């Protein structure tokens, strides 16, 4: 989104940028809604895919299915927040876009403290997505990028955006296939294996989150 939006801003001005962003958001929201709804509807099948080792432990499996259903709409809110970040970065407003992801920990920790239940963690993840969208809204309103979404798959600039997204989607797809296989394997290893893997992954991702994402966002055109 950022390169195409920046190009429109540079070549045609702010109004053209706003018009493109409204269409990009409209198309993206359609995709995000479809993915989120399918995830909720097929949560049981997805849980069997990536946590098949829990099937024989009925209470744990049912809790995992419930948590999957609760968390899947996070994709919608996270995608919406990512679009907001793109607009803010393109308009050189980096502070809010950089701060919003920090709410991830706030949502999870806050929910866990307020509600002592495993489901609280899933609710916290969902709350994080909502908070990220809300946190960006004032900044987006200040720059005038709160126009209602427009669905237009035929717009040439939207098509350019989708063409740019496809290679990245393929690359991320490889990563997530590996993640699903790892989760499936870990579900067979007994209590705590999933948590150990998550903590190790977060430790590995820490430098990327602090340095790589910040630098890459600032160097985008």
Feature names for model-found ranges:
Residues 1-221:
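Membrane-embedded alpha-helical bundles of multi-pass transporters/translocases
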């Amino acid at each position: 989104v950022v390169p195409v939006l920046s190009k429109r801003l540079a070549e045609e001005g702010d109004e053209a940028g706003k018009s493109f962003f409204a269409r990009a958001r409209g198309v993206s929201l359609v995709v995000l809604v479809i993915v989120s709804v399918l995830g909720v509807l097929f949560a049981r099948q997805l849980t069997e895919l990536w946590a098949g080792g829990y099937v024989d432990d009925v209470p744990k499996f049912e809790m995992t299915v419930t948590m999957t259903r609760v968390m899947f709409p996070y994709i919608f809110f996270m995608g919406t927040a990512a679009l907001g970040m793109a607009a803010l970065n393109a308009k050189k407003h980096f502070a809010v876009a950089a701060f919003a992801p920090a709410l991830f920990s706030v949502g999870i920790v806050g929910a866990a403290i307020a509600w002592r239940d495993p489901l609280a963690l899933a609710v916290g993840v969902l709350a994080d997505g909502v908070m990220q969208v809300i946190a960006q809204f004032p900044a987006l309103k200040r720059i005038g990028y709160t126009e209602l979404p427009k669905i237009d798959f035929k717009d040439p600039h939207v098509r350019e955006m989708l063409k740019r997204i496809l290679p990245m989607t393929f690359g991320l797809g490889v990563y997530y296939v590996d993640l699903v296989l790892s989760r499936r394997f870990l579900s067979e290893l007994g209590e705590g294996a999933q948590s150990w893997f998550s903590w190790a992954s977060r430790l590995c991702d820490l430098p990327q989150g602090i340095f790589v994402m910040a630098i890459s966002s600032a160097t985008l055109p």
